[in-house]
Regions:
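Membrane metalloprotein/metal-transporter helix-bundle signature
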Residues: 2-187
Length: 187
């Protein structure tokens, strides 16, 4: 709890521009805050955690870790300006498809689930990378959005783990995510 509070304070701090190292702090804060600025990113990150909880065992750590690794690759592509087509459609599809998979409730091989989630991560990372504020440190910004994404994955994982004993509730959460994804895509 203390570490969450500390991260929140650091993320919300607005450093004076005359201070040395301000790009590191503002870069981290901008990166950490970015995933929380839109329902599309929040839904996708939480859904990765829910899906990992549903799959269980190794997927509980490989799915979030693989997602974050590929999201950082996507972020680098976005920061360098290398184009990825249909980024917004890929982000919306990630929410809808992850929601359907959670609602459907069929087990996946962890490697196949990680490949699917990682392909979605490229779109999310690209969006994060394209929106890096001018003057932000690339490393600090990237660490910020990676840690925020991890926090959302862990929230989904904890929620999903709590719901697995009542699998009907987990499937219903998948339906809710799917409907929210449709709203993001077409609303």
């Amino acid at each position: 709890m203390r570490s969450i509070l500390a991260i929140s304070v650091v993320a919300s701090a607005t450093p004076a521009l005359a201070h040395r190292g301000q790009h590191l702090i503002s870069g981290f804060a901008a990166g950490f805050g970015h995933p929380f600025t839109g329902p599309d990113h929040v839904l996708a990150m939480v859904s990765v955690g829910l899906f990992a909880a549903f799959l269980g065992r190794r997927a509980t750590w490989t799915l979030p870790a693989g997602f974050i690794a590929m999201m950082l690759v996507g972020g680098a592509l976005g920061m360098t300006g290398i184009g990825i087509p249909a980024v917004e459609a890929g982000i919306a599809a990630s929410i809808i498809i992850l929601g359907i998979l959670i609602a459907w409730g069929r087990s996946w091989h962890p490697a196949a689930a990680m490949a699917l989630a990682s392909s979605f991560a490229l779109f999310h990372g690209y969006a994060h990378g394209m929106e890096i504020p001018e003057g932000s440190g690339v490393l600090a910004y990237s660490v910020g959005f990676a840690l925020a994404s991890l926090a959302l994955h862990l929230f989904g994982l904890a929620t999903g783990t709590g719901l697995t004993k009542q699998s009907q509730a987990l499937h219903i959460s998948g339906v809710v995510v799917t409907l929210a994804g449709l709203w993001v895509a077409f609303g």
